[in-house]
Amino acid sequence: MDDIFNMTVPIVVENNGRNERAYDIYSRLLKDRIVLLGTEVNDQVASLICAQLLFLESQDPEKEIYLYINSPGGSVTAGLAIYDTMNYITPNVATVCMGRAASMGALLLAAGEKNMRYALPNSQVMIHQPLGGYQGQATDIDIHAREILRMRQRLNEILMEQTGQSLEKVAQDTERDYFMTAEDAKAYGLIDKVLVSRKDLDIEHEKTE
């Protein structure tokens, strides 16, 4: 999240006729129940995303939340914290990929509420197995290798559950980087619809009401 704060964050000023109020752009989006994951997934980012999801649930436990994703992925444990929170809260969480959803970003995209998982036309989606790189004593390396295999199995199981693909196919496809277009991701079961315009999303929203 440091990358966000190192940038100039736009400020939005709202005037209701009696007074003005300034918001940073992310806080303003939060008012409309929009959460943006636009960076690598790490512990700090996961904490912020989870906090926003929990806050929006406390504001209205019935109204859906929109999670927009443009992420290269990142920490598995941080990503699973977001995944578990999405499932834990009461509101449905719709996911929208813009740009790319890779690795944990792809898993979070697929974790959206069924029939509420979207991607914009030129989005790129990529799935693969967890990356290792631990260095140390042989026994510690063995421990971490077994943990990576356990995580890989769990991530494959989640993708199987979310896509409807067989565990064997998911394991085969994630053996190496597996890139997909938005239409490919729809065919694979990672998303439900490719959105061309806001009108498409509004139509889908009306269907779910």
From Swiss-Prot:
It comes from the Bacteria. Its main location: cytoplasm. One of its GO terms (cellular component) is cytoplasm. Keywords: Cytoplasm, Hydrolase, Protease, Serine protease. CDD domains: S14_ClpP_2 (cd07017). GO terms for molecular function: ATP-dependent peptidase activity; ATPase binding; serine-type endopeptidase activity. It is found in: Cytoplasm. SUPFAM superfamilies: ClpP/crotonase. PROSITE patterns: CLP_PROTEASE_HIS, CLP_PROTEASE_SER. It catalyses: Hydrolysis of proteins to small peptides in the presence of ATP and magnesium. alpha-casein is the usual test substrate. In the absence of ATP, only oligopeptides shorter than five residues are hydrolyzed (such as succinyl-Leu-Tyr-|-NHMec, and Leu-Tyr-Leu-|-Tyr-Trp, in which cleavage of the -Tyr-|-Leu- and -Tyr-|-Trp bonds also occurs). Its EC number is 3.4.21.92. The keyword Transport does not apply. It holds the Pfam family CLP_protease. The active site is at S103, H128. GO terms for biological process: protein quality control for misfolded or incompletely synthesized proteins. PANTHER family: ATP-DEPENDENT CLP PROTEASE PROTEOLYTIC SUBUNIT (PTHR10381:SF70). NCBIfam families: clpP (TIGR00493), PRK00277.1 (NF001368), PRK12553.1 (NF009205). Belongs to the peptidase S14 family. Cleaves peptides in various proteins in a process that requires ATP hydrolysis. Has a chymotrypsin-like activity. Plays a major role in the degradation of misfolded proteins. HAMAP family: ClpP (MF_00444). Fourteen ClpP subunits assemble into 2 heptameric rings which stack back to back to give a disk-like structure with a central cavity, resembling the structure of eukaryotic proteasomes. This is ATP-dependent Clp protease proteolytic subunit. It comes from Lawsonia intracellularis (strain PHE/MN1-00). The gene is clpP.
